[in-house]
Structure formats: structure tokens, C-alpha cells
């Protein structure tokens, strides 16, 4: 079984499948790994595409931002797909965003942009004109384009696109493959889409035990408390006993057993996102 002794891992393992090209765990590692693959391809002179997929939750990890920063500097060609199923980064998909995504990837637009900048730089006071144009463009993009953060880092941003729109995703992938340097495609998805129990309780189905397909309920309800249940009870009691006790979690409040503590002592509960290094040092500072 999955995630059971003697069974399959919950994460990619090369020894388990030839389709798993990288051993990893937890989250926030895909951009770093993808960048490494892309650079190795360039060093060896090979020719293949590299695509890294990362979720909006995993993007909160510091390692992901370190990789984005390095990717922008190295300018290796590879595609990053941001699977955003929590709408935590931008608003809903809109017609304007779709229009901008298509317009900005057109060859005519990219060629025109390069020609205009080259021409202006050759004119008297051209550099000042370019500077003013860039400032105006930046201000407009801040208002209209949800991916301005990535653009400022030096990574081409495409999207957002509806995750259920296969044609739209294929179109952006084809366009991204012709752009030099790292490209991020922002895909908006709905966790559990098409399966009502998962749509109602997405967190419960993040990592689940065997369940009945019709009801979504566990097939074998647990009788005994597990480690997480016991930890949850102990933390609640400690919080009751001592007002100096705080709880810090690196995302996944339910999985770490801190939901009850959070509900009872919200002012003493801190979810720092998937940022384990920060969580440890932050906790040390709190102590």
C-alpha cells in the first residue's frame, strides 16, 4: 500500500519507477531540480525539454524562491508550471489575463519590443525615454498582470489559465517552449474537482487512508488514537496550563495535529507556511 511499511513511497523514488527521475520528498524542491536538469542539458549538449511543477503551497518555501532567483540569473531554458489550487496568488482567471498571456507571447510582440528599444537607445535622450517607458509599463503591469512578481525577477510569466482548459494549457506550453530563459505558466485548478467529497473537504483528501468511493468516508475507521491525536491532546492541555506555550507549524495544521490548539489559542498559534528553516529560527526567537 501507499506510505505503508514495505509499500510504495508517498514521493518520487527512482527505484520504484523509471518514470521517477528524481528522489525527493515533501515540497518546494522541483524548481531547483529542474534548473539543475536544464543546466546539465546545456553542459552536455543534449536536446530535451525540462518542466518543473510546483503548487502554490510549496511556493511559500524559501527554497523555491532561492531557485527562482538563481534561474533568472542563469537564464537556462525550462518551464515552471505553478499549480495554484487555493487562489492565494491572484484573482480568478479573467478574459483580460488570457488576452495578455496570448499577446505577450506572440513573436510579433517580442520582435517589436526589441526593435523599439534598440531604436530608442540610438536616439538623443533615448536612454531617458526608455527609462520612462519602462516605468510607465511597470505601473500598468502592476495593475493588470498578476505575475508581475515573477517578471521583476526576470522570469517570463504566462497566465493565469484555467486548469480545466486543456487547449489553453497546450497552447501556452507550445508558446513557452519558444521563449529563451525560464518561463512560468500559472495554472488555476480546483482541488478535488469532479469528486464531491474531496471538493467539500480538500484538506482531508490531501493524504488519505483507504476510503469508500461513494461516501468519501474511511473504509476502516480508527478505533485507537494515533500519535497525532495524542500530540493534539497534549498540546491543548499544555496551552491550558501555561499561557507562554505557543505552537509553530510549517503549514498543514491538520496533519501536525495543531488544529484544536489553533481554535483555542489563535493568538499563540503561528503557521509560517512551508518554511521549515524559518520556522525553527522563528521559534527560537519566540523562546
Q: How would you name each of these model-derived features?
A:
Residues 34-42, 78-80, 239, 280-287:
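Proline/glycine-anchored alpha-helix kink/cap motifs
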Residues 1-5, 73-90, 108-111, 270:
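A glycine-rich helix N-cap at a beta->alpha junction
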Residues 1-74, 227, 243-250, 258-259:
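Cofactor-binding active-site loop characterized by glycine-rich and histidine/acidic residues
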Residues 86-231:
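Long, well-ordered, tryptophan-enriched scaffold segments
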Residues 61-83, 97-104, 198:
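A short alpha/beta connector and helix-capping loop motif
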Residues 189-287:
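Non-catalytic terminal/interface segments that mediate subunit docking, oligomerization
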Residues 54-60, 82-88, 164, 191, ...:
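Acidic, glycine-rich active-site loops and adjacent beta-strand->loop/helix elements
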